[in-house]
């Protein structure tokens, strides 16, 4: 992780700059007034990764200055959740005098939740042996006894040792209703828990009066699918990454939601299936008949690269498009195509990444009359 100047006194100023930037960027599309969703000013990041530096008997976390690439010591990290900050010094103290746990340890990754769970991954430049497992079990027990709801993972080349789980279970509150989400180590999750809740509430609000079914591309662990299911008869969601699909299935069952179906496909493959260019066995094997769906609304949350031209053209076939973007530059490129047929009816900024130039945006589009 790189330098981050977390300064609550600067929070409103940096937010105002983003509001101005996003408003100016989307002025050509006659977007309505921007809805702005703030982040907590500190302790907002549910994840953090640190390199580990060894100096004689000493051992501590470091980060790198993005401009100079110089390393600097980090004992606390105000961007990260309070849970991560509480654990950081205790973890280092517990490991620094233990040869088995400290030897060739080069990185520590933390994944925490609003629900109070935390997962710690210890990364090594050596193979892990039985002595490491014994010591790691004792470390886990010690931290559990100190009140941390914690699991541990040891990683080395081609090696992963899990004590006792490689995931956390997050609870997000959407308009007073709790949703539980399995979040697996090393797979994508929304980094800012409080803003993630606001994004879900906004998406639910945008689709309130919906008819028929919802199609969702790039659904990840089902983050949006589950909350949006209440507004639609059925939800058909696609995702390519296998661990995310498995988490999505877990989350559907855990939340007892019966009208969501996940299929493992890329957006590009799904476009081909929709257009009848190719038949896919996995649709048949899962008993999915695309023709039986009546999708007037499509939800997309693509990677930073946005959607390719063919996917944009397929998406244009839907009455309403809900688009969440972690990169407004590629959203703008996609809107050059989408705005030929649709106009923006809702426009939002979610401050997922305070004190950085990154912005998360949301637009609701409806077909022009």
UniProtKB/Swiss-Prot annotation:
Active site: 326, 360
Keywords: Methyltransferase, S-adenosyl-L-methionine, Transferase, tRNA processing
EC number in record: 2.1.1.-, 2.1.1.35
Catalytic reaction(s) noted: uridine(54) in tRNA + S-adenosyl-L-methionine = 5-methyluridine(54) in tRNA + S-adenosyl-L-homocysteine + H(+); uridine(341) in tmRNA + S-adenosyl-L-methionine = 5-methyluridine(341) in tmRNA + S-adenosyl-L-homocysteine + H(+)
Binding site for S-adenosyl-L-methionine: 190, 218, 223, 239, 301
Keyword Transferase annotated: yes
One GO molecular-function entry: tRNA binding
Keyword tRNA processing: yes
Matches recorded under InterPro entries: MeTrfase_TrmA_AS, MeTrfase_TrmA_CS, SAM-dependent_MTases_sf, TrmA_MeTrfase, U5_MeTrfase_fam
CDD domains in UniProt: AdoMet_MTases (cd02440)
BP terms from Gene Ontology: tRNA methylation
GO cellular component terms, semicolon-separated: cytosol
Function: Dual-specificity methyltransferase that catalyzes the formation of 5-methyluridine at position 54 (m5U54) in all tRNAs, and that of position 341 (m5U341) in tmRNA (transfer-mRNA).
HAMAP family membership: RNA_methyltr_TrmA
Family: Belongs to the class I-like SAM-binding methyltransferase superfamily. RNA M5U methyltransferase family. TrmA subfamily.
PANTHER family listed in its UniProt record: TRNA/TMRNA (URACIL-C(5))-METHYLTRANSFERASE, TRNA_TMRNA (URACIL-C(5))-METHYLTRANSFERASE
Protein name (Swiss-Prot/TrEMBL): tRNA/tmRNA (uracil-C(5))-methyltransferase
Gene symbol of the encoding locus: trmA
